[in-house]
Amino acid sequence: MVRVAAIDCGSNSTRLLISNVENGRLENLLKQHEVTKLSENLIKTNKIGDDSKKRFYKVLRKYLKIIDNNNVEEVLCIGTAALRNSRNSDEIIDDVKSKFKLDLKIISGEEEGYLTGIGVQSSFEDLENYLIVDIGGQSTELIYDIDKRVNVDSKEIGVVMMNENYLNQNPISVLQEDNAFQFFDKMFN
């Protein structure tokens, strides 16, 4: 048996999962979720801002204490859309390595969807002909199985991005709503 930790550095939140792995099966021991807003203002600046980095690093510090207290043997740290799309992701990867001794790996949208699919499939026996929709802050992954062939389609559309670009007034104007629907239709048709 091996005790592992996965840190999912998403566009809006950073998650921690600690599990025991034995014979290819997971026994989940602990799950944590913290809002870090890595993608805050990413659309405007094309980079992850200082406030976002501070929140993110604070959460990583907290998670590493939890990992140490749980005798974890292996840690996997994954970055998704915000880190894929930011101009300063290399700087953040270097910071995470030097400050926390973690190798932050940025994965593609397709890899993200594939890993999501594996996670969902592990919760069900004989899952066939399904559709999984993973809506993130900056991207949405569609994972679907047709006749035992798994397919992944990653779209650059997420809740934070839609909020910042199209739905940023309260109440939402008719024009904003129309623009949001047009963008949504363009992405999925």
What are these regions (language model features)?
Residues 1-9, 17-132, 143-189:
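Nucleotide/phosphate-binding catalytic cleft detector across ATP-hydrolyzing
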Residues 12-14, 138:
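Conserved Rossmann-like nucleotide-cofactor binding loop
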